Amino acid sequence: MDVGQAVIFLGPPGAGKGTQASRLAQELGFKKLSTGDILRDHVARGTPLGERVRPIMERGDLVPDDLILELIREELAERVIFDGFPRTLAQAEALDRLLSETGTRLLGVVLVEVPEEELVRRILRRAELEGRSDDNEETVRRRLEVYREKTEPLVGYYEARGVLKRVDGLGTPDEVYARIRAALGI
């Protein structure tokens, strides 16, 4: 039986996780699961889930675990890259159980590290270019605060399991991508 494979991308909003996860998925034949993209799609389409999560996302808060896990289970593939999930220890533990149940091997957890002021600059520039109304400076700072509070504990969790790969997120996308491939050994 073929065992599934997974890579998790961690890092604050604006670190370039999505860009790098997309490239890795495309070049290596993985399916990229971006919970943010999936949720924004539901909001845009006005689905029942979208209506439930719209006010949560507008506040810059995290969407509840049960809703996220429901999405993940529906979207799981044999070779998958998680972008923006897990975001909490509870989600990480739930994902561990799900990967175990499905026989999916975790190849590594890539932590893309970028200084905070650079993150704010990147996110505000992206919001301007893409017309993303959920990204204004107040919301960006709130998202970074939520990240520090909820997601940074995952660094220790995955470090203790020996699967964390720290990658400098500064430089050109090609430079960062090369660091990620080297860190994962692929």
Swiss-Prot record:
CDD domains: ADK. One of its GO terms (molecular function) is ATP binding. It catalyses: AMP + ATP = 2 ADP. Residues 34-63 are annotated as: NMP. AMP binds at T35, R40, D61, L62, V63, G84, F85, P86, R87, Q91, R132, R143. Pathway: Purine metabolism; AMP biosynthesis via salvage pathway; AMP from ADP: step 1/1. ATP binds at G14, A15, G16, K17, G18, T19, R126, G171. Keywords: ATP-binding, Cytoplasm, Kinase, Nucleotide biosynthesis, Nucleotide-binding, Transferase. It is an enzyme of class 2 (transferase). Residues 125-135 are annotated as: LID. Consists of three domains, a large central CORE domain and two small peripheral domains, NMPbind and LID, which undergo movements during catalysis. The LID domain closes over the site of phosphoryl transfer upon ATP binding. Assembling and dissambling the active center during each catalytic cycle provides an effective means to prevent ATP hydrolysis. Catalyzes the reversible transfer of the terminal phosphate group between ATP and AMP. Plays an important role in cellular energy homeostasis and in adenine nucleotide metabolism. Belongs to the adenylate kinase family. This is Adenylate kinase. It comes from Thermus thermophilus (strain ATCC 27634 / DSM 579 / HB8).
